[in-house]
Amino acid sequence: MAQGQQPIFILPQDTSRYVGREAQRINILAGKVLAETVRTTLGPKGMDKMLVDSLGDIVITNDGVTILREMDISHPAAKMLVEVAKTQEDEVGDGTTTAVIIAGELLKEAEKLIEMGVHPTIIALGYRNAALKAQEILEEISMEASDRDTLMKVAITAMTGKGSERAKEKLAELVVDAVMQVEEDGEIDKDNINIQRIQGASVNESRIVNGIVIDKSRADTSMPKRIEKARIALLKYPIEVKDLETDAKIRLTDPSQMQAFIEQEEQMIRDMVEKIKSSGANVVFCQKGIDDLALHYLSREGIMALKRVKKSDIKRIEKATGARLVTNIDDLTAEDLGEAGVIYEKKIFDEVLTFIEECRDPKAISIILRGSTKHVAEEMERALEDAIGVVASTLEDREVVAGGGAPEVEIARKLREYADTISGREQLAVSAFADALEIVPKTLAENAGLDSIDVLVDLRAAHEESPYMGIDVFDGNIVDMKEAGVIEPQRVKKQAIQSAAEAAEMILRIDDMIAARGFDVSSKDEEDMEGMGGMGGMPPMM
């Protein structure tokens, strides 16, 4: 700037900006630390995390996406990896920790290449091609899954090490039965499986309800508590006199006029109840409120009614009973009613629930999940949700791969062969991608208290003979995972590798960070981050 000229501020003076290698280093560090945070939770021997929020509420879990969601991370690069975990959870239901640690390792390997002088664009291109090749290799080593026994193995593998160890066979049975029941034309909507978590009993008392359970009680205690041969009406709008859409004032000159108004309102309510009765309905689920007078008349007619039922529950009741949601009571007919063998109210532990059972071929069902304490029941629920996701994926795709780190080692082996066919610096990126994938078997070994280097060497040697060789973390041996029954959906691995590669590529392409306010990474903070392997003591990351 020439002498005497005033400086020009394009950005606010309190803005932080990091350019080039500095920006890349900060983002890579954030990704590495985040991956290190969840790494110890991977596998059957993984450890749990205790998360305590500002209100003192405690969550104890080893579920990757739950940990990341509860941590409330604000660092922009770290948030990208959190999104990877959330996408993995939404798409396939499991593999969240795997996806995050692969992404973190890809960034770690990329950092080495950048220090060697390889441009981030070349690394990103190599990663993209390696990810595509990995998908092809996964197809080659996949196995067909078509029977119930395979689905059971998939469910048990997903739940192993997630707090449900003692009852995993029982829970796997529930999951497989539930998923197969709600399947429609080869597709599974996981929302049609409702998990009702109730503490106060052994997990072995968990069961499937051939229908739906909702956490609602009768709208009035004078109504029947149990209805056999239930005929179900679903109403979208309230059973009450509608308010005027515009403000209006009415002048009354005689007390009898007031009485006439009251009688007219009562008659309208009676007509609504009569319409419900004439349709043949003996149970009503209303999405909105129900007038007290309407409750009185419904009770007098022996009709059970529940008000303010959640929209999601209404949808499941539709699927389970065949009922149709009616927007106007005047349009309600017998054809709109659903059927169930019995509907009853029951108190379990300290919760009052309504059971809709003995439905004819329900396409939405409930699982009653028991647990001795609140924290146990919550972790069981997370394990069950993971298992439902992987069984649904398997049933839809009918493709599985071996577990125990077998697919990662096989893909890494073949990627190194593929790298030898590539010229230029991109070859280094493909080889780095292969090295990064081996973080999965290494972590499984470390979490089991084994020597990761010895395990990895043995695995590489075993894969010269079979692509299904993985690590048995319970005895430390290298075994055929296919024969051991440790299998996972192909979709879980595909999604994890693809999402991790895309996130790493996106982070590597960032060469300029502009933070509006308060974002700063001092050298001291970086030393703290590198030395901790967790997220605490890290102001810029939280």
UniProtKB/Swiss-Prot annotation:
Keywords (A to Z) from UniProt: ATP-binding, Chaperone, Nucleotide-binding
Entry-linked SUPFAM superfamilies: GroEL apical domain-like (SSF52029), GroEL equatorial domain-like (SSF48592), GroEL-intermediate domain like (SSF54849)
Residue ranges of coiled coil: none
Highest taxon of the lineage: Archaea
Alphabetized InterPro entries for the sequence: Chaperone_TCP-1, Chaperonin_TCP-1_CS, Cpn60/GroEL/TCP-1, GroEL-like_apical_dom_sf, GROEL-like_equatorial_sf, TCP-1-like_intermed_sf, TCP-1_chaperonin, thermosome_alpha
GO molecular function term, any single one: ATP binding
Pfam family, one: Cpn60_TCP1
Functional note: Molecular chaperone; binds unfolded polypeptides in vitro, and has a weak ATPase activity.
Oligomer and partners: Forms a Heterooligomeric complex of two stacked eight-membered rings.
Family as reported in the entry's similarity comment: Belongs to the TCP-1 chaperonin family.
The name this protein goes by in its record: Thermosome subunit alpha
